[in-house]
Amino acid sequence: MSSSSSSEDELEKKVTKEQKKKETKSKKRQSEAVEEEKQEVKKAKNEEEVSGRLKDSDGNEMFEIGNLRYATVSKFKGKEYVNIREYYIDRDSQKMMPSRKGISLSKAQWANLKDLIPEIDKKF
């Protein structure tokens, strides 16, 4: 009987070793996945730092004009607009959110504003 119990012990040890190997492999895969995700986040942050531009929730580039004021180019109902908007920091999420203070200019309005810039500059 001792030989059968020792073979059972060996079998149990073998099964336990295999389970540990599987757990180790699973943990390795999980840690590799976490590491890959961290690298992707770092890469995205680096790209943002290199370009010096933020992006809004729709993926549009945000050009900083001043303190929490940004210009973006976006499409709405098939037309492109230049949006100049003031942002605020949300208390709960600590994310930058657009405020109601802002203006959207069509391409024609944007072109008019650009043409008026020399005259406006003379007033300063």
UniProtKB/Swiss-Prot annotation:
Residues 1-61 are annotated as: Disordered. GO terms for molecular function: DNA binding; transcription coactivator activity. SUPFAM superfamilies: ssDNA-binding transcriptional regulator domain. One of its GO terms (biological process) is positive regulation of transcription initiation by RNA polymerase II. InterPro entries: PC4_C (IPR003173), ssDNA-bd_transcriptional_reg (IPR009044), Sub1/Tcp4-like (IPR045125). It is found in: Nucleus. The keyword Acyltransferase does not apply. One of its GO terms (cellular component) is transcription regulator complex. Transmembrane segments: none annotated. Residues 11-21, 39-58 have a biased composition (Basic and acidic residues). Belongs to the transcriptional coactivator PC4 family. PANTHER family: RNA POLYMERASE II TRANSCRIPTIONAL COACTIVATOR. General coactivator that functions cooperatively with TAFs and mediates functional interactions between upstream activators and the general transcriptional machinery. Binds single-stranded DNA. This is Putative RNA polymerase II transcriptional coactivator. It comes from Caenorhabditis elegans.
